[in-house]
Swiss-Prot record:
Modified residues (Tryptophan amide): W181
Keyword annotations of the record: Amidation, Cytolysis, Disulfide bond, Knottin, Membrane, Neurotoxin, Secreted, Signal, Target cell membrane, Target membrane, Toxin, Transmembrane
Cellular component terms per the entry's GO annotation: extracellular region; membrane; other organism cell membrane
GO MF annotations, alphabetized: toxin activity
Name of the molecule in the record: DELTA-miturgitoxin-Cp1b
Source organism: Cheiracanthium punctorium (Yellow sac spider)
Keyword Transit peptide included in the entry's annotation: no
Function: Spider venom toxin that exhibits cytolytic activity by forming an alpha-helix across the membrane. Lethal to insect larvae. Causes instant paralysis and death in the larvae of the flesh fly (S.carnaria) at doses of 20 ug/g, at doses of less than 10 ug/g causes reversible paralysis. Has cytolytic activity against insect Sf9 cells. Causes stable and irreversible depolarization of fly muscle fibers, leading to contracture at higher toxin concentrations. Destabilizes membranes.
PTM statement from Swiss-Prot or TrEMBL: Cleavage of the propeptide depends on the processing quadruplet motif (XXXR, with at least one of X being E).
Signal peptide from the UniProt entry: 1-20
Amino acid sequence: MKFSLFFSVFFLAVLHACLSESEIDLEDEEHFMSSDSFLSEIQDESRGKTCIERNKECTNDRHGCCRGKIFKDKCTCVKNGKTEKCVCTQKKWAKIIESYIGDIPALPKPVDDKCVPKHADCSKRKDECCKGGIFKYQCKCYDMYDDDGEKTDLCGCVSPVEHQAIEGALRIAKKLIGDRWGR
């Protein structure tokens, strides 16, 4: 009896702690609501960089190689004594696939907010999310209640779980194929 009483009180205490909101929780929500999408700012900053063209040196910036028609070029390094030279190259399997498929039109970039980027607010334009890797992002909304009890929507362009799983599986397959045939 004492054992079950102890665990029931313990369970109620944990349940109360989980369901109660503190002032810190409310401040975090206000900060999230007031700040624009942090991830979109990072993405905008990274888009501003210029990429290194194919067959050019990439020793100082190994992740800055440009994209080919479909796949991103890789920085391949060769050690010559103590010095190391790196050049942006295209993997053999990527070259074969790109030559087989041919020209693929480039994905349209968001110009003048024609589409809503990932993790940005899409509450007013729910059908205008940009395209991700393979699939188009979808606008997902959550109900938020402020201190006055008024309901507002918090919406953002996100990738559904099933799309993330498919893209992840394709990334792994691409890596496995690249490790076997690309070197």
